[in-house]
Amino acid sequence: MKITFIGATHEVTGSCYYLEAAGRKFLVDYGMEQGPDYYENKELPVAPGDLDFVLLTHAHMDHSGNLPALYAKGYQGPIYATEATCNLCDIMLRDSAHIQMFEAEWRNRKGRREGKPEFIPAYTMEDAMGVLRNFVRCPYDKIIKPAEGIEVRFVDAGHLLGSSSIEIWLTEDDKKEKIVFSGDIGNLNQPLIKDPVYIKEADYVVMESTYGDRSHGERPDYPVMLAEIIQKTFDRGGNLVIPSFAVGRTQEMLYFIRQIKEQGRVHGHDGFTVYVDSPLANEATTIFSENAYTCYDEEAMDLLNKGINPLSFPGLKTSVTTDDSRAINFDEDCKVIISASGMCDAGRIKHHLKHNLWDPRNTILFVGYQAIGTPGRALLEGATEMKLFGETVQVAAEISRMPGISGHADVNGLLNWARAFETKPKHVFVTHGDDTVTEVFAQRLKEELGYDATAPFSGTEYDLLENKCIHEAVGIRIVKATASPKTTKAARAYEKLLAMGRRLMTIIRKNEGCPNKDLDRFARDIQSLCDKWDRTDI
């Protein structure tokens, strides 16, 4: 009975965990790496076709996005997820496949002119459709049995519609162990969805640490803040453009705007129009409504019971076709435009930036995280111009942001989730956080809760029956390609040496408190190694 850590170790994206128990082999999540990639990930230790099943925490691409690639490599087994997660994956994986194929077509068209070899997409639409047929819909809070000796329960993680923490009971050799995967833990009091469920018992815990080193601070009154921005922008004759993630954040914005309109918070602009220009966002909004009775919180359900749709209001218009999208920019009235992608690196939002960035009457409002290197981050950091569709556009619009809005719990929320266990777990594995954040949060779990906590690197293996590490992997940093393959190889070898140095320091710290004679012998061994390799010829 063991767990092997594959992805989202000392990194935020690419979640994947491999488990062996009760004679079965299975995964928890199989996500896509997004943004900068700093560490090498261990390959799956078995062929995809040898896996028995997959458990999926939620639909975000960094947890589900590589499932079609798993199917393409031979996996034909079931994927267990909540009803809403299955519904969201149906649109998100198909959308991802479309992007993969479009990018491959574009790169190959360009590459043929330059004589480059054909670029193969990570997966195709056929792969996405194939894997979607294998999804198994599971209710919250009900134990299912994917295999003899393995029991599973999904509980609400409060992060996204359908998101879950997963409780797994494993029985082997008449011994039973419980491991809990936190998934992404949500904020309290988010619009629409319920708060995270706290779990009382676990032998082992694998938990995220996205914001394990920081607090979101006091939560602003978002409808009031948004109303003030709309008012100010409309009063000067401008448009409000909101780059927004299609799934989750767009629905939050609609929820806030419905409140603003209902309460009459924008004066002198009655009946203003709100465009949602993202086919994926429009499909996701429909899925939110279809899963209301299992996923909505009490406040949203009260609205529904009164016959009020929390995500709809007078003046809301959705665009599907590209002609619909283009027509928005010919509407001369003041308006709100919500479009993807949230970081402005793709999608229809780029067209709206082209038409609105240059005008000082307009406002570009960011409502989500902007990664380093993205156009959204550049705008927030004061870019004075932006290249869009081969044209340089001057930035004259007001650039603004709504602070603290996040689907992830901050460090206090994470500690409260971990504190809910009534007895201390045997071990807590901290993952899904930036390199230093995982270590910082693991240390806080030790100091504040007295937990045995570590932040494993990819490839680390842990025996769940014996409660011991079988193999402690070291982080192998990815070396950027250089002009010389020889230089790249040398850099990779040197990085491995540094990784072993980090491992040595870890072992030294673990030996604190050991008998003096053992420490003396350890020190002599290290001294001998240093004497052997201390180079005087360089």
Indicate where each model-derived feature is located.
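Charged, amphipathic alpha-helical linkers/stalks
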Residues: 459-518
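A polyampholytic, Gly/Pro-enriched intrinsically disordered region
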Residues: 100-105, 292-305, 387, 470-494
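Generic long, charged, amphipathic alpha-helical segments
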Residues: 387-418
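C-terminal, active-site-flanking charged/polar segments
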Residues: 359, 434-479
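His/Asp/Glu-rich metal-coordinating catalytic cores
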Residues: 1-55, 64, 71-252, 256-273
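Short, surface-exposed amphipathic charged segments that create phosphate/polyanion-binding patches used
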Residues: 150-154, 287-295, 415-416, 465-477
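Hard-cation-handling environments
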Residues: 229-375, 386-387, 437-439, 444-447, ...
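Short secondary-structure boundary/capping segments
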Residues: 94-99, 103-107, 221-223, 256-261, ...
